[in-house]
């Protein structure tokens, strides 16, 4: 069954030339495209570049001929931009409200948009959630902070919405600067109305309730479960009702009150890997009920990341930590295949992407290391663009899209399938 699910996952990824959400078509950071660029610089192998007004942690979202960007236009205003992927020209801009501010590394443009090819949904760190069509016509808008209270995260809200079929799934896990409860909600994507909203209580204290992760889905037989990490726990929820089905603990064994989680869970089949604040990183099998800490925990590893979300093809799992130390693990067992291996020194906030048999990972200085996605460590290239980078690379039709503080770069030549 697991092999069949993995085959289905890989086939669906291969058919997708779009990058419709933060971690790509299957929420795993994987593209099955081939013949992608390996080398570039500020002047080499750049098809076009578009000036950006400010940095962001949001990833470019791509559908056919259009790119969608969450943009902090200045110290106050936020906007959703639509860009022509053929030449980098801005097609339209739609306001996403005011209230932008700097929160440590972040500003309020950090959540990535999502699209189904007919509509685009954009969420900001100020709580504005808006649906527009591909021409920018507004379908609906909500102000989540106005409805449910201010987001209380120490570093500002940064979780992206999860789009699945007819619904958006949004988490607000916080506690550092608020006494309001954390919650998860499902919205009808066409109306913006709640299907459900459930609170998600934990025993986490001070900053530990804060989670900057994005939800994912784990498949159990013919059904799917919503997986949320944060507040020192991992939880699985029923898609229809939001009811918590299972909970795994052990992510904060020392009871550190500043144990916020940034790196998101990644799932293939019924197995989900959940990073925390470096250690421990754990894998759980979906489908349990109640406390699954012992019954469904598959493995534990103490060499996880803090900020970059790991990437997997369902067989191997590649991890790059904040200091540029890389590991390769067996996805199913957690056994280390290789590592620690040093890539270019620096601070890493972007997440690695797997494509064309290669891992692409960019540090905050704009250096993208390309290393082979295999059970043997081999650096293939180091590509330098001297600019500040928090955003992860997006892949579409043979091209790479890298967003820096000053520019959005389109790298390589397009090859339509």
Predicted segments with their positions:
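Bacterial N-terminal signal peptides
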Residues: 2-13
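Noncatalytic, solvent-exposed loop/strand surfaces
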Residues: 15-417
């Amino acid at each position: 069954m697991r092999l069949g699910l993995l085959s289905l996952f890989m086939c669906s990824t291969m058919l997708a030339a779009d990058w419709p959400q933060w971690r790509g078509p299957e929420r795993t950071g994987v593209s099955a495209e081939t013949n992608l660029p390996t080398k570039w610089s500020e002047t080499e192998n750049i098809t076009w570049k578009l000036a950006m007004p400010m940095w962001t942690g949001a990833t470019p979202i791509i559908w056919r001929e259009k790119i969608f960007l969450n943009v902090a236009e200045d110290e106050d205003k936020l906007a959703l931009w639509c860009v022509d992927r053929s030449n980098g020209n801005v097609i339209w801009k739609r306001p996403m409200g005011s209230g932008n501010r700097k929160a440590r590394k972040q500003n309020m443009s950090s959540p990535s948009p999502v699209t189904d090819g007919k509509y685009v949904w954009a969420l900001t760190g100020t709580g504005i959630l808006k649906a527009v069509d591909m021409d920018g016509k507004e379908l609906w808008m909500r102000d989540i902070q106005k409805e449910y209270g201010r987001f209380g995260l120490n570093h500002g809200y940064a979780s992206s919405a999860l789009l699945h079929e007819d619904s958006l799934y949004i988490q607000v896990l916080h506690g550092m600067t608020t006494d309001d409860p954390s919650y998860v909600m499902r919205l009808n994507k066409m109306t913006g109305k709640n299907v459900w909203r459930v609170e998600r209580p934990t025993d986490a204290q001070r900053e530990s309730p804060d989670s900057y992760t994005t939800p994912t889905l784990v498949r159990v037989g013919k059904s799917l479960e919503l997986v949320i990490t944060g507040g020192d726990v991992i939880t699985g929820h029923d898609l229809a009702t939001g009811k918590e089905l299972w909970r795994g603990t052990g992510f904060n064994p020392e009871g550190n009150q500043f144990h916020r989680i940034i790196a998101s869970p990644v799932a293939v089949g019924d197995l989900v890997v959940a990073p925390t604040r470096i250690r421990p990183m754990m894998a759980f099998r979906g489908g349990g009920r109640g406390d699954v800490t012992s019954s469904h925990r598959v493995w534990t590893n103490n060499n996880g990341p803090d900020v970059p979300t790991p990437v997997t093809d369902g067989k191997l799992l590649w991890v790059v930590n904040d200091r540029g130390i890389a590991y390769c693990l067996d996805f199913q067992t957690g056994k280390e295949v290789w590592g620690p291996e040093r890539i270019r020194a620096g601070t890493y906030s972007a997440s690695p992407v797997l494509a064309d048999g290669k891992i692409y990972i960019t540090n905050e200085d704009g250096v993208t290391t390309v290393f082979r996605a295999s059970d043997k460590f081999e650096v293939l290239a180091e590509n330098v663009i001297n600019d500040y980078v928090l955003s992860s690379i997006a892949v579409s039709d043979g091209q790479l899209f890298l967003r820096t503080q000053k520019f959005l770069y389109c790298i390589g030549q397009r090859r339509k399938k």
